[in-house]
Amino acid sequence: MARRTRVYKDAVPDARTAIAIGEAVMLPVYGRHQVLSQRPQVAELQGDVWYVHGYQPPISAGGTAEAYIDKHTGRILCITDGGE
């Protein structure tokens, strides 16, 4: 018997999903305190890639945790701290 595969247009259809995935992959890399202290996370769609990043007050040094996620496949393209 052939197995049916359901094809979805976008694995990451909205900002809420992108943020959930972004936080999930950033937590093991940067730690719970670092990631959660940068809430609220923001997700911006840039072409076919979700750019997920945290908030950091303007007077703070360093960068925020960032993740780039393919909208169609959900593949993590890059995780970085966005530091200068």
Give a label for each model feature:
Residues 1-84:
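Long, terminal "pre-/pro-" and other extracytoplasmic accessory regions
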